[in-house]
Amino acid sequence: MTTQILPVILSGGSGTRLWPLSREQHPKQLLALHGDASLLQATATRLAGFTGALEVAAQPLVVCNEEYRFITAEQLRAAGRPASALILEPMGRNTAPALTLAALAAGEGDPVLLVMPADHVVTDRAAFQQAIDAGAQLARDGAVVTFGIVPDRPETGYGYIQTGEGTAHGARRIARFVEKPDLETAGRYVSSGEYLWNSGLFMMKASVWLKAIERYRPDILAACRNAIANGARDADFMRADKAAFAACPSDSIDYAVMEKLPSDAAAGIEAHVVPMSCGWSDVGAWDALWQVADKDAAGNATRGDVMLHETRGSLVLADGRMVACIGVDDVVVVETPDAVLVASKAHTQEVKQIVGRLKQAGRSEVTNHRKVYRPWGWYDSIDAGPRFQVKRIVVNPGASLSLQMHHHRAEHWIVVTGTARVTRGDEVFLVSENQSTYIPLGTKHRLENPGKVPLEMIEVQSGAYLGEDDIVRFQDTYGRG
């Protein structure tokens, strides 16, 4: 059997430093931050047209949080790269357990795993693929390979890899991994030419990773084996057992394995780093997005309805409303329907401090966008006040909401486009454009779109309590309780 490259996409990050666009229920890998595709979609298509020594499997293996399973699957389908399996983590345990789950689920043929975080940007796909081709040939022969970004400036936000002697395919030995340095130390690293940025990209055979994790962290391997053995398969979703995975220690690929390999000859596993210059960024903060974004002559990167005057070196993103900036330099302005961020570009790492305070205050802006995606479509909470809430709801063709009931609210539905099939108690009837219906408090009901075009409607809720947790589900197509 020919050895294949199996892309393994790790899609579990939250990206709190990219608030207010990134939220707990809609993290940065699901956002279109650089171009029209989301970061996840761009990652899934990054090997398109690959012509290296090894073939690439047509479908990636994706590890993601259970909360994001439906939108992750839909984005991959829309990108033409549906996953061979979506491995669902019931909770985050960092990258070493995530990769171990993927290696256990990789199937026959002992493929070379290309481990890619879902939330990176690469602007030079050809250079990326050339480096992957080099790494794949080393990994096919049993090595563990990481990829180091050739630095173009001193950077304190990344870890570094000190390189040793050259090996095959343009790679080098790994001398050591170094934590994020201060600016002076980072400058020395860049000047020496011996150091690369740690990209978080890896390649190795599935069997080699399992051998390494068994040597250094057998507790992680045992917990992941239990989680897979006691998990469940539901169509394309592979659910890790919650109790077994909860017992798994949290650790990163670097700490669990990579930092130990270079000094452990007895392991019998070579560790190489392939230098890479491909316009890479982990987009860890708003200033990092500005670095890779297209800019005008004044160094401004904009998106949406933006007007600038006497403004330089800034990142301005408008999601819905018009944003104007006058006489400001080196700022970040991010507008969303329910929150606006204004920050100095030099302080964007501190956005997480605001997120922490929002969490402490119990603010919904840290958790959800006003527009919330569901497996059946999405809704936008366009207005709310005492005892009422107004939503714009879009249901995908052929999709349906659960058969449900609310204890504390009634609902009025007005169809804007499409046709709705409504279950209300014992009744089942159609509601067409410009028609409406009413769902009394405490009545079992269901909304379906039987048509071939999206169903759009306005919902007005009224009652004493309007929280999303006031719901009793009796039947649900998507397995939600």
Predicted feature descriptions by range:
Residues 3-5, 57-58, 81-83, 108-111, ...:
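Short coil/turn connectors at secondary-structure junctions
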Residues 457:
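Noncatalytic nucleic-acid binding interfaces
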Residues 3-4, 207-414, 419-438, 445, ...:
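Left-handed beta-helix
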Residues 29, 42, 46, 71, ...:
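Alpha-helical scaffold segments in soluble metabolic enzymes
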Residues 1-9, 16-126, 133, 149, ...:
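Conserved N-terminal catalytic core of the sugar/cofactor nucleotidyltransferase
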Residues 92-97, 153-155, 183-185, 280-281, ...:
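A short acidic, often aromatic-flanked loop/helix-cap motif at beta-alpha or helix-coil junctions
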Residues 10, 116, 415, 460:
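Catalytic metal- and UDP-sugar-binding loop of GT-A-like glycosyltransferases, i.e.
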Residues 123-247:
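Conserved core of the sugar-phosphate nucleotidyltransferase
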